[in-house]
Structures are given as C-alpha cells and as structure tokens.
Amino acid sequence: SPESVQERFDATFTGVSAVEISLMEHELMNSDSGVTFEDVMELCDVHANLFKNAVKGVEVEDTEHPGHPVRVFKDENLALRAALIRVRRLLSTYESVDDEEMLVEMRKGLVRQMGLVGQFDIHYQRKEELFFPIMERYGHDSPPKVMWGVDDQIRDLFQTALVATKSLPEVPISTVKEAFEAFATEFESMIFKEESILLMILLESFTQDDWIQIAEESDAYGYAIIRPSEKWVPERQPFVEEKSVEEPTQLETVDGQVQQVIDTPEGQFTITFTPKEKETVLDRNSQQAFGNGYLSVEQANLILNHLPMEITFVNKDDIFQYYNDNTPADEMIFKRTPSQVGRNVELCHPPKYLEKVKAIMQGL
C-alpha cells in the first residue's frame, strides 16, 4: 500500500538533505538511464511526497529578517494561501445563495480574489529568473528544469480556472469549482516543494552575497500581493586585515629574483621570490580602435545605454553575455538582471519553449 511504502521510505531515508535530492535528480537526468526531465517532472509529486518526512531542515542566520528573500518568499506563500481560502469560501457559499444582486457581487468578488491569486506568477517569475541562475552556477541544474516545467503547468491550470470564473453564470458553478480545485491542488503542492525542498537547497548552497544580489534585483520583478516591510541590510564582517603600518625595510632585485628583508623584534630575515607579472588593467577612459574611429569603454557604454531600444547580446557559445541599461528594470520588455549574465540562453527560457529557442538560435 502507499502507506507501507511511505513508512519504509521514511525509515530508510530520514535525514536526507535537499542538496542530495538535487544530486539524485541530476544523476537521473544526466546518466544513461534514459530518464528525461519530462519523466522526472511527471513524477515530481510522487517523490516530493515520499521525501516530505525525510528532508533535513537547514537554519541560516537572517532568513527570518524582514526583507530577506527567504522571508519574502514565505510571506508571499502565506498571502497566496489566504487568497485561495477566500476563493474557496466564495465558491462554497455561491451555491447556497438565491439573491441575484448578491450573486452579482459574489462574482465580482471571485474575479477580484482570483486576480490576487494570479499574482503567484510574479512569485514564480522571480524564483525562475533570480534563484535558478544561481542554482545552476552551483551545479543544481536539474531541479530548476523540473520545477519550471511544473510552474508552467500550474500557470495553464490557473488560466483555465480564471476563464471559468469569468464565465459565470453562463457555466455551472460546479465547473468553476472543479477547475479551481485542479489548479489549487497543484499550486499548494508547489508551495510544499518550494519551502521543504527548494529553499533547503538554496540555504545549503547560497552565500550571503547571493542573497544580497537577489534582494537587490527583486524589485525588477515585483512581489505577489505583499511587499517587503523593510529593506534587508545584513551586518558585514570584514575578513581582510588592515595592512600593517610598518613596511619591509628593504627590497632588492638580484637576477630577476626579489629579495625582501623584513624586520622583526628578534632580528631580520630575508625572503626571495619571483614576482608575478602585473595584469594589465583596462582603462575605461582610454581610446580604443572602434569601427571607423575611436571610442573609450565609457563612451561606448554611454552610446549603447542611450539607444532607444533594448539590446541583448548572446555570444557564439550561446552564453548571455551583455544587455544595455537604457530602461528601468521594472519597465523592460524582456526582464534581464545581472544574475542572469553568464547563463546559457537555453536556460533563460521555460523548458516548454526549449525547442523553439534552439531553432531560433540555430537560425541566427
């Protein structure tokens, strides 16, 4: 029975980390087993339910601080759950109401509450565009593919439910309830996957710098239902010691070797080393040959940023390498943020569009 399988699984796999689940998915999808990400996506609910009692929790400082991306993510899920409850109540009450004026108001309320629920798309987009690129950098490339595919299925289910809701009273309330519950079931399951598996992977893998970058870029995508109550500014500890005021007493060069004499309370000692070649630092204001004339990097940057168009550059290896900065992030036609630079362009799009993206790239 499913219960006995769950019991055996819990007894065997208790204490598994979310990162280990990620590695399992990666191994399945990248081995010769013939398992594709579509197969893993189809069984996503199955293995999420199996692992629900086994995943080991992770605690990281500051994640419950207002404004921290993890706190924002969880707060959004709470607000979205509350909106789901309100829709369910309205749908449940609708069947028992006979007054036509009240039914009209209830239909308006349903559409309004569905509009709030629909803001989950902002939550998903921020997850896909800010969390997933950093996950891929750390080698966790399989969970994003699977989760993005399921996200798109949930988006489709929501659209079906929204169309049905807006079609009242032409369609029966039973049809609306059925469509809404089909969406809500998958949506609530995704909340569990986000908070019990996805966030655990992120907390084990991401550095404070990663979270700071996500917090800084989140405004470009917006927030679902609620906004952070304050900006998260973590305390930063300097790890580089200040240079000592005392400098070495002597520096001599002998046959290309540098000898450095250092004074200590016990006396002097000499170290000999071959200095590294100094890397040439590009002067952003120096003139470089550019097309039919000369431009500095700063001048070229200003020109590109003042063109009346959004520019994205993908190199010959299909790596997203550059975008110009002429439009506020929240007004971009195609939202791009610094965390996406360096990402394979195929990973910048939902899995269901992968073949279309490949065809476009090959055509270019």
Indicate where each model-derived feature is located.
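Small-residue-biased structural context
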Residues: 1-121, 125-363
